[in-house]
């Protein structure tokens, strides 16, 4: 068992946390939902960090502990500076607006990778690619994965040593579309070796993978699945929860979460042994034996 003996899944916050949990490296968990960014402090109180968040989804703290935000509604990625000002990191590619930046990860050099899918209405899309991009500096953006290798990218994770980029490919709006977790080799320059694509896990015709994290033993914690089918596109064959996978894709364990939709995970607490899960407008927590990787 990866969880502590007797550990139970607990409700940490019911403020409306639907996505983006991230530990700030000190004493708080940040997360998104209801158009806001929230902060859950060490005492268990939830605060509104930002009221108008631009439809914030995925969150990340960079090496200088600045909050980087996927603003899905504003179709951009921003960074909050120490003085509270906002720096736009990415808002277009080749003159076209992004679809709706969703989730992000960072490599050891501080380069940020983000996914740009479009769920729901598609009439405002300016590009026909739902890709993965790398930000080297504000406004310096490169597409690293396109439609030839991913269908609808969502959660991302760079492995230790920048060896791999894991991509949750989750097109849950179409029957028979991708609900897969891929692994790609990362080159030193931050580009992706497309020929290295390896299938790690397939959710079949259920709800596919979303956000993910890795623990200190290299095991993947992947949010995914669905407790109640959503016909015609999604069955409930893969239940909602956290899928604990080996680096090669073996299902080692499953942590069920009772509410849909299970969207993301984060390690937190002073020892990084509290696993937080966003699902059903709630932030859940459970204690685990092995800490998560520090960011």
Label each region the model flagged.
Residues 1-295:
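Sequence-structural signature of mature extracellular/luminal beta-sheet repeat domains
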């Amino acid at each position: 068992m990866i969880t502590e003996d007797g550990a139970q899944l607990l409700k940490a916050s019911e403020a409306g946390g639907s996505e983006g949990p991230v530990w700030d490296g000190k004493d708080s968990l940040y997360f998104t939902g209801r158009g806001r960014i929230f902060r859950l402090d060490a005492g268990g109180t939830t605060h509104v960090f930002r009221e108008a968040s631009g439809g914030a989804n995925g969150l990340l703290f960079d090496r200088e502990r600045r909050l980087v935000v996927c603003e899905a509604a504003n179709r951009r990625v921003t960074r909050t500076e120490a003085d509270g000002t906002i720096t736009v990191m990415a808002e277009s590619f080749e003159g076209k607006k992004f679809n709706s930046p969703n989730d992000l990860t960072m490599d050891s050099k501080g380069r940020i990778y983000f996914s740009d899918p479009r769920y729901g209405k598609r009439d405002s899309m300016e590009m026909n690619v739902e890709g993965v991009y790398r930000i080297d500096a504000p406004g310096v953006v490169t597409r690293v994965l396109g439609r030839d290798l991913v269908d609808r990218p969502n959660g991302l994770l760079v492995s230790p040593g920048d060896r791999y980029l894991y991509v949750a490919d989750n097109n849950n709006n179409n029957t028979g579309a991708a609900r897969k977790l891929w692994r790609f080799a990362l080159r030193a320059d931050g580009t992706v070796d497309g020929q290295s694509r390896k299938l790690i896990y397939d959710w079949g015709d259920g709800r596919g993978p979303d956000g993910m994290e890795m623990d200190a033993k290299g095991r993947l914690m992947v949010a995914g699945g669905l407790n109640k089918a959503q016909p015609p596109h999604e069955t409930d064959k893969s239940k909602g929860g956290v899928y604990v996978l080996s680096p090669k894709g073996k299902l080692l364990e499953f942590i069920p979460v009772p509410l849909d939709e299970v969207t993301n995970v984060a390690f937190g607490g002073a020892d990084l042994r509290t696993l937080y899960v966003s699902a059903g407008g709630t932030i859940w927590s459970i204690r685990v034996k092995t800490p998560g990787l520090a960011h």
